[in-house]
Curated annotation (Swiss-Prot):
It comes from the Archaea. It is an enzyme of class 2 (transferase). It catalyses: L-seryl-tRNA(Sec) + ATP = O-phospho-L-seryl-tRNA(Sec) + ADP. GO terms for molecular function: ATP binding; L-seryl-tRNA(Sec) kinase activity; tRNA binding. Belongs to the L-seryl-tRNA(Sec) kinase family. This is L-seryl-tRNA(Sec) kinase.
Length: 255
């Protein structure tokens, strides 16, 4: 069993890639599950609805989890996974089960993504493609969950891809660093992100925009940042940036 996490903006060719890879491996006798996020979204709406994206994501993660618990050789997690934290969620599902995982990043230009989106049967709004493209966080090998990443500039299933998958995608959570993380820096990340959180909630309260749901989402985001970013300055920048996106989406429905 192994987990292959696909990532790339809408229109990068992930689903075509996944289908071709699954077909080739099945011909060799592999038991492959292709978990296609867009197909799951099709059960939730007839036309793209950003308000249901969180529900779609939860359904996608649950489907991947179910497949990882089955007797299979490969699970392909096919979604944009445009934030690093989204790929981390999937890696943790594999790690919990002691299943090796790897990432295929389909690096694609915006013009190509927009053209392919227009050509697909049920295109998503162009502004959504542009927004996700602008927000996309490419995998970085210094993150333990992105250590085994294959970057492709086209969506062909090449010998390089097959070798990457068949090698076992051997990735383990890294050993503890020789230099332990300074506890004071961890505490500073917590304190400073709490300060930013308080500042944001005061601002929202003054404008009458503070809601319980928005507070919950910002709290979840802050906990995610605290658990994954060690540098206080970087943590504050990341939290501010992501928090503003969450606020815009909640207040204006930008999804």
């Amino acid at each position: 069993m192994r987990l292959l996490i696909l990532t790339g903006p809408p229109g990068s060719g992930k689903t075509c890639f996944a289908r071709e890879l699954a077909r080739e491996l099945r011909q060799e006798g592999w038991r492959v599950a292709h978990v296609e996020a867009d197909a799951l979204r099709g059960f939730l709406w007839d036309e793209f609805d950003p308000k249901l994206e969180q529900v779609a994501r939860e359904l996608f993660l649950k489907s991947v989890e179910t497949c990882l618990d089955a007797e299979l050789d490969l699970v392909i997690a096919d979604d944009t996974n445009y934030y690093s934290s989204m790929r981390r969620e999937l890696a943790l599902l594999a790690l919990e089960r002691k299943v090796p995982w790897g990432i295929v990043y389909l690096r694609t230009g915006l013009d190509t993504c927009l053209r392919r989106n227009r050509e697909r049967g049920e295109p998503i709004p162009e502004e959504v493609v542009r927004r996700i493209y602008d927000r996309f966080e490419p995998p970085e090998p210094d993150r333990w969950w992105e250590r085994a990443t294959l970057v492709l500039d086209d969506s062909r299933v090449s010998e390089e891809v097959l070798e990457f998958v068949e090698s076992g995608l051997r990735v383990e959570k890294p050993k503890k660093r020789r230099r332990r993380t300074d506890p004071s820096s961890v505490n500073e990340v917590d304190v400073r992100t709490r300060q930013v959180m308080g500042e944001l909630m005061r601002r929202l309260s003054e404008t009458g925009a503070a809601t319980q749901e928005l507070g919950r989402k910002l709290s979840e985001l802050r906990r995610e940042i605290v658990s994954s970013v060690e540098d206080p300055e970087k943590a504050v920048r990341e939290f501010r940036r992501r928090a503003e996106e969450v606020i815009r989406e909640c207040l204006h429905g930008d999804g």
